[in-house]
Each structure stands twice: as structure tokens, then as C-alpha cells.
């Protein structure tokens, strides 16, 4: 899975995807590493197109030109936000591909292996970077859809804040994310020790 991240120095693109994410919180001050998405929506159209173009080049090498693409799009979009998605989907580098827009909750359900046609009802929860989407799907239709502006990034920051408050230790959000994932494994009842490195 490729991260939707981009690293830039001024107007020059340094890295895209996982390579850019590896630089997150490690790059010098003159290199900016961020995501073109914010709260589940496209925040920077130009950077999103660059990220997509980079990913498409990798996919074309594996699957060949002319593959089918599906865009998972949110339901609660404004006219301007819809225009951004359509502009990205109709970019010139995608013209050789078949591109379909799919409602994000439906795409989530398919990815989880939910049988949409023979389904009495399923609740789908998608925790994104800055938002969480709750959906109830039955008979292939979305009955309820609700989004809140809290996601994984806020959880990471909360973990960092708790470590700082309790142990007077400053850690980065990537370390906070790793701790969050360990603590979130509810099925694992074994206590596990974790070494955390930070700044006192």
C-alpha cells in the first residue's frame, strides 16, 4: 500500500508516496512533507495530481496501460470538492484507463469482503488520517452515513501528549502511531514491553 504523501523543497518535488512518508518528521526544515488530503477531502489539487501520476507510473509497469481504476469518493462533498475529484479522475494521464467513481462506504465494504447483495445490514467504520466515517449498508444501499473530524492523526497526537504528560518525554507522531497500533490490538491479551525513544 502506498502512502498519499509528498515531500517538496520549494517548488521542487523530492519524494512521493512511501518514500515521502519515510522522510516525515525526519527531513530538514527546508523540506515540507505532507498529504494533499485533509479531513478526507482533496486539499491541494496540484499535489494530489502529482501523487496520483507517480502511483500510476508504478501501476502501469505492473498491470500495463489501460487498467481499470476505481476512485472511492466521500458522500458529503460540496460542489467545489466534487469538481476536484472529477478533475483528478479526468487528468490527461488517466485517459488510457477506465476510471469509475465509487461511493467510499461501498468501496470499504467491498474491500472488507462484504456481500452487498445478500446483506441484511453491516456497519462500516473507516478511520482515516483526520476523519472517521460511519456507514450502515443493507441490500447494496447506504442507509446511514456520518463523518466526524477525528481520525488516526488526532489519536497519534493524543498518545504523544499522554507520554509527554506522564513521562515528560517528547516523541514524534510516528512513534505515537506505533504505540497506538500496539495498544489497539484488543485480541492480544499478552502484555508487551515497548522501548520508546524521545527527547526529555
Can you name each region flagged by the protein language model?
Residues 130:
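Conserved Rossmann-like nucleotide-cofactor binding loop
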Amino acid at each position: 500500500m502506498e502512502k498519499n504523501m509528498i515531500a517538496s523543497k520549494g517548488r521542487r518535488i523530492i519524494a512521493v508516496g512511501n518514500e515521502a512518508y519515510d522522510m516525515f518528521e525526519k527531513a530538514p526544515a527546508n523540506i515540507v512533507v505532507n498529504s494533499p488530503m485533509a479531513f478526507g477531502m482533496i486539499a491541494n489539487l496540484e499535489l494530489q495530481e502529482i501523487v496520483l501520476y507517480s502511483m500510476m507510473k508504478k501501476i502501469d509497469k505492473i498491470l500495463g496501460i489501460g487498467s481499470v481504476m476505481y476512485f472511492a469518493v466521500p458522500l458529503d462533498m460540496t460542489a467545489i470538492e466534487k469538481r476536484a475529484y472529477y478533475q483528478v479522475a479526468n487528468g490527461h494521464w488517466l485517459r488510457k484507463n477506465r476510471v469509475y467513481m465509487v461511493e467510499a462506504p461501498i468501496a470499504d465494504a467491498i474491500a472488507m469482503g462484504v456481500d452487498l447483495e445478500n446483506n441484511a445490514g453491516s456497519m462500516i467504520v473507516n478511520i482515516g488520517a483526520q476523519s472517521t466515517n460511519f456507514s450502515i449498508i443493507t441490500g447494496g444501499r447506504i442507509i446511514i452515513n456520518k463523518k466526524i473530524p477525528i481520525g488516526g492523526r488526532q489519536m497519534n497526537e493524543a498518545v504523544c501528549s499522554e507520554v509527554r504528560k506522564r513521562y515528560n518525554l517528547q516523541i514524534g507522531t510516528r512513534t505515537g502511531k506505533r504505540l497506538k497500533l500496539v495498544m489497539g490490538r484488543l485480541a492480544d491479551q499478552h502484555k508487551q514491553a515497548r522501548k520508546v525513544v524521545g527527547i526529555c
